[in-house]
Structures are given as structure tokens and as C-alpha cells.
């Protein structure tokens, strides 16, 4: 992300991408959208108009990432409101517009780049609380990653499969990659046993996911993905 570029420079980041590629690893740049510097930023103004200036600055940032040599994609995080979308006129429409504009800008640079976004796992209420209109966003994004973090929702492994299936049913073109919590919960960051993490991953695959994302690095017990 921008911190890596600021700290190490473009050349070092591109070298990292090239080295990772030699090991069979594709690098996607993580990009925060409506949350930065510890603060949430609304996608709309008080009168319901879009924050075009902010949108343009974020699209410019995304284009810089898209131009990195060898990069595989750009991942959008915090593409949402913090549970308050219903209080903002045109909030859903603003996020749809921003996402469409950003995806078009990135794909214009390189149509093969994967634009993904993390979304909340609450399916029916995503739009109302977070402004995440999955059927519409999935028309523009290449990949939608629902954060199906069972520990945070006091759910079991079966919830991972059923929620993945719901997102697949809602998607209008984007692949669904299941996002998993590799630790017990935000209140207990102890690592899940590798066997449990494997079972959770299998639940996502059984639900139809085309990929599995583990959150987060440094907080998971490894297992061999080829055994899924």
C-alpha cells in the first residue's frame, strides 16, 4: 500500500513483486478507501452529493498501484460506511459510482488486473448499514471477498458455507473468495488450530468459493492448501 511505497520506494516494491512472482506468489496492493488515518470518511456530503474530489484522489492512488510493474491486482478495503449508510442520502449510489469509476480506471490501464473488495458478511443488511450493494458492485469488481469471520459473529463452520453460497447467489459476474478469520475472534487473537482453519477453508470451497483469503498474516497456523 501507500506506506510500503513511501517507506521503501517504487523500485523496492517492484523488486518485491518480482521476487514473490519467482516463488509463485501474486501480489495485490491493499488499499484503504473510506477509512484512513484512523478516521472514517463519508462517500457523500451532507446534501447527498458525491465527494468527487475525494473519489478522484482515491482513483489516482489506485492508478498508481495499477502501474506498478508485475502487480496482479488492487484490493479495496473499507469500501463502505461504518454501519451508518442509512443515515446518508445517496450513500449506496455513491459507493456504486465510485467503485464503477475506479474499476474502469484500473482496467483501462490493464484489463487483466484483478480488482477485489472486502465486504461485510451480513448479506441482507449490507446495503442498509454499510452501503454495499453486492448485486451492483459485483458487476464492476472482479472479485468480492465477504469477511466471513465466524468468531466475531459467534458462528460455526457451517455458517461459512451457507454465507458463501448467499454471496454467490447475489453476484452478477464477480468471483466470490471467502475471507476467513485465522484466529478465534477480535476479542481473542489466539491462532485457530490448523485443522480447524482447514475445515473452515473447505467450508468456503464447498460453498462454491473460487478462492480463500486468510486474515491475517502472522496470526495463522499454516496447512497445505493443496490438501483441500
Question: Where do the model's predicted regions map?
Answer:
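Alpha-helical scaffolding within the catalytic cores
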Residues: 11-15, 121-136, 157-169, 197-200
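Active-site groove signature of glycoside hydrolases
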Residues: 54-90, 210-213
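Aromatic-lined carbohydrate-binding/catalytic grooves of carbohydrate-active enzymes
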Residues: 1-10
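Substrate-binding cleft of secreted/luminal carbohydrate-active enzymes
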Residues: 141-142, 146-157, 163-167, 172-228
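Aromatic-lined carbohydrate-recognition surfaces of secreted/lumenal glycan-active proteins
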Residues: 26-35, 75-79, 94-131, 174-185
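Short, well-ordered coil/turn segments that N-cap beta-strands
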Residues: 21-27, 70-72, 111-113, 142, ...
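Active-site-adjacent "subsite" loops/lids of carbohydrate-active enzymes
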Residues: 13-21, 26-69, 198
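Substrate-binding cleft/loops of secretory-pathway carbohydrate-active enzymes
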Residues: 115-153, 187-189
